[in-house]
Amino acid sequence: MVIKAQSPAGFAEEYIIESIWNNCFPPGTILPAERELSELIGVTRTTLREVLQRLARDGWLTIQHGKPTKVNNFWETSGLNILETLARLDHESVPQLIDNLLSVRTNISTIFIRTALRQHPDKAQEVLATAHEVADHADAFADLDYNIFRGLAFASGNPIYGLILNGMKGLYTRIGRHYFANPEARSLALGFYHKLSSLCEQGAHDQVYETVRRYGHDSGEIWHRMQKNLPGDLAIQGR
């Protein structure tokens, strides 16, 4: 186990998460007692207690007053906020994780983009107009793309879609910085935003579904060609 955390709390958090991931602390089992675990990791009990509370909030553990701390099956109890952690833990599975993430984005965005353009066209156009001034480099496009999808999610009138995008932000923007280094990807995205703006202006809401699906397919083709050069820094760094 190689841990690169920059603080005692970060070290303890990574130690416990990696132990859960590697089945040293299997789902359904009881975590060692606080004193034993703090000595094992090499941190104070106060630090450990703070870390355990944070991991419980993220779904890794269940803490109940007067009972031992239980290890959860994180696939069943955690949220989107652990995406980057999963990417760090299992780099070999990152391509599949990203494919799943992008598939979810396409599937839900066919719904909220159509709703945004139909029910709140002025808000949708305001979001899409931000593409007019974007600088032609990867970082700018990564932020723009995330903010356009997120903005349209909230413009749909259903904030739950926006919260889902919030949960994807970390890994989503890291992927974007790699993906949008490709000029073809930037050009495709600009064409997509322009097409959505035109559909909104024309009131052609019935064409949104196919437009979004086509963009998901075409951007996926570019992404798959780029995966062989996937960088190793898509996961978060140690705390």
Curated annotation (Swiss-Prot):
Keyword DNA damage appears in the UniProt entry: no
Boundaries of every HTH gntR-type domain copy: 6-74
Disulfide topology: none
UniProt GO BP: fatty acid metabolic process; regulation of fatty acid metabolic process
Positions of the DNA-binding region: 34-53
Keywords, in A-Z order: Activator, Cytoplasm, DNA-binding, Fatty acid metabolism, Lipid metabolism, Repressor, Transcription, Transcription regulation
Subcellular location: Cytoplasm
SUPFAM superfamilies assigned: GntR ligand-binding domain-like, Winged helix' DNA-binding domain
Chain coiled-coil ranges: none
UniProt subunit comment: Homodimer.
Protein name per Swiss-Prot or TrEMBL: Fatty acid metabolism regulator protein
Gene source species: Salmonella typhi
Lineage: Bacteria, Pseudomonadati, Pseudomonadota, Gammaproteobacteria, Enterobacterales
